[in-house]
Regions:
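Charged, low-complexity intrinsically disordered terminal segments
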Residues: 1-178
């Protein structure tokens, strides 16, 4: 797929070969451009690759309900979220038409458990497996780290309003001086 995706696969394969449980959850629609041989190499190395919300004729009414959860959690203690674009045009500086810019954020502390929970919910939807216990939610991940507070809201498209829509609506409705 390109330098970014190839670099990612190299690291995932390395960790899987060192007996680290590596879970990769891909949106079945948004990840279609990934090549089958790229996926096969990951699986052959022991990476657990799972497709979320596969398109079927009987699920077409939900085709637009895609997952945009992009999360990396390392040992339940360090978390990243952001765009995680795998195409090479994300390597650019964002100042040119053919070069985009990507931003990702690193977290430690209680927010990591929230990132893990977002991933775990999608993983459970796709596989039926509940990711629980110290492997995914170590007690140390709930301790405060640093002096910056962060919160995370997980929301996935569904029928009716989502938690994110309600959060923003209530936040806007609660404004008293500025918005």
């Amino acid at each position: 797929p390109g330098a970014v995706a190839d670099s990612l696969s190299k690291y995932l394969i390395d960790r899987a070969q060192h007996k680290v449980r590596v879970l990769l959850l891909l949106d079945a629609f948004g990840s279609q451009p990934l090549k089958r041989d790229w996926i096969r190499k990951l699986k052959d190395a022991g990476v657990e690759v799972v497709w979320l919300r596969k398109l079927r004729w009987y699920t077409l009414q939900k085709a637009a309900q895609r997952s945009h959860v992009r999360v990396v959690v390392v040992d339940g203690k360090i978390g990243y979220t952001g765009g995680f674009g795998l195409a090479d045009y994300w390597l650019g500086d964002g100042h040119h038409e053919d070069q985009w810019r990507e931003s990702n954020v690193r977290f430690e502390g209680p927010t990591v458990a929230a990132l893990q929970a977002a991933f775990a919910a999608a993983w459970a939807e796709a596989t039926g497996e509940l990711l629980t216990g110290d492997m995914f939610f170590p007690r140390s991940s709930f301790a405060d780290v640093g002096d910056v507070q962060a919160g995370l809201m997980y929301s996935i498209p569904t029928t009716g309003s989502t938690p994110a829509e309600r959060f923003f609506a209530l936040s806007i409705a609660g404004a008293r001086r500025t918005l």
